[in-house]
A protein has these predicted regions:
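Bacterial N-terminal signal peptides that target proteins for export
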Residues: 1-7
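Cleavable N-terminal signal peptides
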Residues: 7-8, 18
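Predominantly soluble domains enriched in secretory-pathway, periplasmic, or organellar proteins
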Residues: 13, 19-370
């Protein structure tokens, strides 16, 4: 016997089924591009490689650094003299929340950001911010930044060995926070802090020079998943005051705090300053600043697998792997491209080149996995 279904009920069931299908689709991955030249944050939808939202605010001045909180509810954006905090509950449509001024009157750039011990369920842990010009690192409680007039719980400065600080990372499985220091008129070095006690770690030594060359500028780095090794890029070049262009990535033994090996680049891949890692895939990705190139490094064999020429003069200003590990996004700054190149991590080919009238001087791409 046939059972007839009323038309109204049929329409309702069809609508519910369609909604269930839509809700089961993966959420779009979005990336934030810090466009320094236009003082903007541009939101990229990685499904289409298009810019879907543009953020501007009077306090967002020449942004070059930033970091998502693991809860994915906040994004801390560095700029000149100020840090803006954005509500990212809807990551594709962030909303300005507030401005923090760690040092009133200071016009230095807040470049390095780290969320220490932040959870995925609350806006907690610590937010570390490095000001490269005033050689200071500020440590706030994330919860305090939600209130009025927050003050840092600790400040690291020149007396603690901080000099032109740039990039911060938490070493996996330890309370160690590592910082690159990149003075242009001296050898750069790594410093380590204890994330709980807020003290400088001095054993076996306080500072580690990764190249011991004036103006070498250790820049961005990534840890192996077990925290045993750090892969350190170098930003120093003749244009920035170094006597020569840097041509090596240093591999640091994290336990002994010593340089294990230096990996040379080919002559056309100059100044390998930016690093990201695929912990499951066993690859380290490095972007060179001049004649921008993505260098694909096998972390197990400790050898270069591929050089991917991005074309143009440069500069390349970073490399960011999407959370699903399928694509790499590389900002290409002024004066040449002002674009974001997209590389397929499987085929190792350039699959897109993103441009926009507000994509001026991009300095960083951040995903929710950072």
């Amino acid at each position: 016997m046939k059972v007839s279904i009323p038309v109204g009920l049929l329409i309702l069931l069809t609508w519910v089924g369609a909604q269930a299908q839509v809700s089961s689709l993966p959420a779009p991955q979005v990336g934030y591009v810090m466009a320094q030249g236009s003082s903007a944050i541009l939101v990229i939808d990685t499904r289409t490689n298009t810019i879907v939202h543009k953020l501007k605010h009077a306090d967002l001045v020449r942004p070059a650094g930033g970091r998502f909180h693991p809860s994915l509810k906040r994004y801390y954006a560095g700029g000149t003299g100020k840090v803006t905090i954005w509500n990212t509950t809807d990551a594709a449509h962030p909303v300005y929340l507030k401005t923090v001024i760690p040092a009133p009157g200071n016009t230095g750039e807040y470049r390095g950001f780290l969320i220490y011990q932040g959870s995925t369920t609350a806006i907690d842990g610590q937010v570390w911010m490095a000001n490269i010009q005033d050689s200071t690192v500020y440590v706030y409680r994330a919860a305090d930044l939600e209130g009025a007039d927050p003050t840092p719980v600790n400040v690291f400065a020149a007396v603690d060995g901080v000099r032109a600080p740039h990039f911060l990372m938490h070493r996996p499985g330890t309370p160690e926070v590592w910082l690159t220091n990149r003075p242009v008129n001296a050898s750069g070095y790594l410093l380590r802090f204890h994330g709980e006690t807020h003290t400088v770690i001095t054993t076996p030594t306080e500072k580690l020079e990764t190249m011991s060359i004036t103006g070498d500028e250790p820049n961005e780095f990534s840890f192996s998943p077990d925290g045993a090794l750090a892969y350190v890029g170098h930003h120093g070049a003749m244009l920035t005051g170094s006597p020569s262009d840097q041509m090596h990535v240093a591999i640091v033994d994290a336990a002994t705090f010593t340089v294990k090996k230096r990996i040379p680049m080919i002559a056309s891949a100059t100044v390998p300053g930016y690093v990201d890692i695929d912990p499951e895939g066993g690859r380290v990705y490095v972007t060179t600043k001049w004649s921008p190139t993505v260098v694909v490094f096998d972390s197990k064999a400790e050898r270069v697998l591929r050089y991917i020429d991005l074309g143009g003069f440069g500069p390349g200003y970073g490399v960011a792997l999407t959370p699903d590990k399928t694509r790499l996004y590389i900002p290409l700054g002024t004066p040449a491209q002002s674009a974001v190149a997209v590389v397929d991590a499987k085929t190792l080919t350039v699959v897109a080149n993103i441009v926009d009238t507000d994509l001026i001087g991009p300095r960083l791409v951040r995903f929710t996995s950072y």
